Regions:
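Compact, glycine/acidic-enriched structural inserts
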Residues: 121-156
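Phosphate-binding glycine-rich loops and adjacent basic patches that engage nucleotide phosphates
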Residues: 2-7, 110-118
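Intrinsically disordered, low-complexity regions of eukaryotic proteins
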Residues: 63-66, 70, 109, 121, ...
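A short, terminal or domain-edge coil/loop segment
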Residues: 71, 75, 97, 110-113, ...
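C-terminal end-of-chain micro-motif
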Residues: 1, 157-158
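A surface-exposed partner-binding patch
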Residues: 1-105
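A short pocket-lining beta-strand/turn micro-motif at the edge of beta-sheets
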Residues: 94, 118-121
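Short, flexible beta-strand-to-coil junctions
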Residues: 47, 99-106, 113-117, 125-130
């Protein structure tokens, strides 16, 4: 399944905001084009995801922790990527911050952006993952869903 099909099935439940032209310009000014593939920008322009709260049960979360996540605004994405850890290190590895944990940890959620994948996995990168050299051991990153489309198919929307 692809992301757009998955989003079309839940479109009526999405109560967030779509990406504005001003926010689009803000994103492309501050983040690398590699982190902002066309499919991702189009998704944010077409679907009101910004500010939506998504939940996923522990059973459906591949990390077995469960998800209670808010989809970040473009301003929050840029802040997480450029001003806060683990985002500062994660973007160097190709991870784009897209969500924040609402359960209490505040751990950010990311998509692994690569040129050849238009349905990346959704991962959680805990704040305490950085080693003493401020590096991330990618084997410690918590995979939540093997694809974003699968996450949209499996989640509940608050």
């Amino acid at each position: 399944m692809n992301i757009r099909f998955a989003l079309d099935t839940i479109r009526g439940q999405l109560s967030g905001l779509k990406l504005s032209n001003e926010e689009y310009n803000f994103l492309i000014t501050h983040l690398s084009p590699i982190l902002l593939p066309d499919w991702f920008i189009k998704m944010l322009l077409d679907y009101p995801l910004i500010g939506v709260n998504f939940t996923l049960s522990e059973i459906l979360d591949e990390s077995d922790l469960g998800v209670d996540m808010e989809w970040l605004s473009p301003k929050q994405m840029v802040e997480e990527a450029l001003e806060f850890y683990p985002g500062i290190v994660a973007i160097q590895l190709g991870y784009l911050p897209i969500g924040s944990c609402l359960i209490g940890s505040g751990d950010p959620y990311f998509l692994k952006m690569t040129l050849d994948n238009d349905d990346p996995s959704l991962v959680r990168i805990p704040h305490d993952i950085l080693d003493e050299n401020e590096k991330i051991d990618e084997s410690e990153i918590e995979q939540v869903c093997f694809s974003l489309s699968h996450f949209f198919e499996s989640c509940q929307i608050d």
